[in-house]
Amino acid sequence: MLSNTIRSNFLKFYANRHHTILPSSPVFPHNDPSILFTNAGMNQFKDIFLNKEKVSYSRATTSQKCIRAGGKHNDLDNVGHTSRHLTFFEMLGNFSFGDYFKAEAIAFAWEVSLSVFNFNPEGIYATVHEKDDEAFALWEAYLPTDRIFRLTDKDNFWSMANTGPCGYCSELLFDRGPSFGNASSPLDDTDGERFLEYWNLVFMEFNRTSEGSLLALPNKHVDTGAGLERLVSLIAGTHTVFEADVLRELIAKTEQLSGKVYHPDDSGAAFRVIADHVRSLSFAIADGLLPGNTERGYVLRKILRRSVNYGRRLGFRNPFLAEIVPSLADAMGEAYPELKNSLSQIQKVLTLEEESFFKTLDRGGNLLQQVLKSSSSSSCISGEDAFKLKDTYGMPIDEISLLAKDYDYSVDMDTFHKLEQEAKERSRKNVVQSQGTSESIYNELHLTSEFIGYDHLSCDTFIEAIISKDHIVSSLQEKQEGAIVLKVSPFYAEKGGQVGDSGEIFCSEGTFIVTHTTSPKAGLIVHHGRISQGSLTVEAAVTAQVNRYRRKRIANNHTACHLLHKALEITLGDHIRQAGSYVDDTKIRLDFTHPQAISPEDLLCIETLVNESIRENEPVDIREALYSDVMNSSEIKQFFGDKYSDVVRVVSAGHSHELCGGTHAEATGDIGFFRITKEHAVAMGIRRIEAVTGEKAEATVHQQSEVLEEIATLLQVPRDQIVSRLTATLDERKQQDKRLNELENSLIQTKLDKLIHNCHQRQGITCLVHHLAEHENHRLQQYAQCLHQRIPEKLISLWTTEKNGKYIVLSRVSDDLITQGVHAQDLLKAVLTPCGGRWGGKDQSAQGSAPALPATEVLNETLWQWISTQLI
């Protein structure tokens, strides 16, 4: 693969120039709610640029997995219809953190363009900011001035946000020649097809204030990004990114599966959509995301449904995406081993989602017919209906428009676009970063805390800051609530699913009860609580003491959580991925990927494996290691989405080996005993196990034993005969229910004999209007079904009953009358509209309700009048 060669040579080039090669971060940022997906190489370095995080390296290079399919950067609707839009792409980049600046960045970029990308220097152009004389002068060493262009803020100024680090940027472009257009320079190339931008160099040299002023940064940074797929297309000389390398391989696989031939014109859009989307979906699932109904999961579901809709154009009527994934793993698995490691999980998730959506599409097709019918008076599909078809059933708006055109219908696009924009705003609102006053205060403190809590549960230290009611204060008085920052702290701050410590901070002047501990930013430990007696002031010498008994229970539960995770993997398979966890002093909660409920036998096996590890009482080994040494180890579990520092902690307990920053038991035997209390689904493809340990586990067993004893007493049998007695009792109940059903059916048939005798006939059609007593309302459907079985042709029935203070109405029409244009839902519309009622259903059967109804005789006359209008 050409992409593998370019990626490898790019990283090697910068590694040979003292850059640290770092792995790609996941496709979603773990601690940055301001963006849905990782959309640039600099995302993982954001805290470094903001001076919130210190690292051991000053130069770095990466190939970053990116997704642009939500929020501000959303290319989803363009994919398949343009030459280069993608939802998934790789961003090659080099970064300098206060090290080199413009001169070196430009020199490196020029050398890479010639020696790694092998571009003809005569085809390279550069743009700079109109005020960046320095960059212009630097480029003059490599390019003639007529190939360097000055542009405005719109094109050549980069900022992270409205305030903060920002700076000029310089873009590199390559002239692909006259076959890509007649533009004579990048300024004339309005669609950017001939002079294709392939690299952006960002020079962070300013700090924008809230007033809009640009102040020089004390440390200047470099952030560059070059799209790998675009580079491959340029080097291979293809017209689009889809005609070379990985994407062409995926298109070829889709050709094989569909039996159709790809063409690079508009007719090939379906192939391009599938090739791109299967990459986004596969990488997202491998990184721990799953399709869902909110936020990132909702975007993944939209991507998958868009893939399926385009797949249907190629003739796919059953799940097919999973069959393409092995080709992707073969092409990119060497660079991204998570694709191969998660292959079965990716395929399972895709297949389950596709199966679900194909069922939804069947309903959607019926809905479209109903929409067309309900819009018959205006010959226009409403914006609300169009949006529902797109948002709920995944039908692209262009497909809705085409289908509407087939029936000479139009679509209210103005309302549709308005609703779509409102939905985008709601989605964006869910993920927009909301910084509370307290968080802003913590950022202003410019403090860090030294954590010593792995080895010490108490220490003498100093108070560095106090916060109360969102203000920095100098002291806290008795009964006041607030937060304290210490210079040195033994308190573990909540993170990684483990709750923060509690305890006390005290001196002779006062005592502060710590209820919980957090870390609002890297390196800062904040102790929350209240003054129980006396007062405490900033700079006071104090003793910090963790509640050691609570800490021990938390540590035991955290180690048990690791053992549980390993037991799940052993019992259920290597597709298991942690999707979330919560550990405190009373319980364990572990969310994980698994497509179905766990059987009682497997739950018992999981519980047994954990307790076996506990009984072995092996020491829990915790060691520090360089992340670069362990990041590719298949034995050591790490969690995609977590951001790891240069040095990590490897926690080994029994057969479990995980990267973890939490606190743990000294030996597995400290856990005592493990008991699962609950297993259930929390989302599609996500299961949750809840468990307890130690004394809590023993108490749970005792409680369950007491319940069994009570049941045995009620059944008047020994405990070992409970199951057999209940089985016999339930069998007896089934027989009684069967006899009761037979009796009720006999009574229904007897009643139907009378009802049939009272049916009215006109024009060869049999009609019945009947009111059921309220005590029979649960048999409304049964009466209607039985009557239509007895009289299968030319029958219309209307049934009413009462329930919870309102009238329920059911209409049913025989199949032969449906073909003549008589429909059950239309009958209810005629009956219930004058009553202020509501209804819904299908042609054969429909049901509705109303606050009041006319007498049965009036309904009977209404029915015949309506029939006469239908059969004219």
UniProtKB/Swiss-Prot annotation:
Q: Which GO terms describe its biological process?
A: alanyl-tRNA aminoacylation
Give EC number(s), comma-separated. Answer: 6.1.1.7
Query: Enzyme group, top EC level?
Result: ligase
The catalytic activity, as recorded, is: tRNA(Ala) + L-alanine + ATP = L-alanyl-tRNA(Ala) + AMP + diphosphate
An MF annotation (GO) of this entry: aminoacyl-tRNA deacylase activity
The cofactor required is:
Zn(2+)
Q: Does the keyword Transferase apply?
A: no
Query: Does the record's keyword annotation contain S-adenosyl-L-methionine?
Result: no
- What keywords appear on the UniProt entry? Aminoacyl-tRNA synthetase, ATP-binding, Cytoplasm, Ligase, Metal-binding, Nucleotide-binding, Protein biosynthesis, RNA-binding, tRNA-binding, Zinc
What's the record's note on cofactor binding? Binds 1 zinc ion per subunit.
What is the role of this chain? Answer: Catalyzes the attachment of alanine to tRNA(Ala) in a two-step reaction: alanine is first activated by ATP to form Ala-AMP and then transferred to the acceptor end of tRNA(Ala). Also edits incorrectly charged Ser-tRNA(Ala) and Gly-tRNA(Ala) via its editing domain.
Q: What is known of its domains?
A: Consists of three domains; the N-terminal catalytic domain, the editing domain and the C-terminal C-Ala domain. The editing domain removes incorrectly charged amino acids, while the C-Ala domain, along with tRNA(Ala), serves as a bridge to cooperatively bring together the editing and aminoacylation centers thus stimulating deacylation of misacylated tRNAs.
**What protein is this chain from?**
Alanine--tRNA ligase
What species does this protein belong to?
Chlamydia pneumoniae
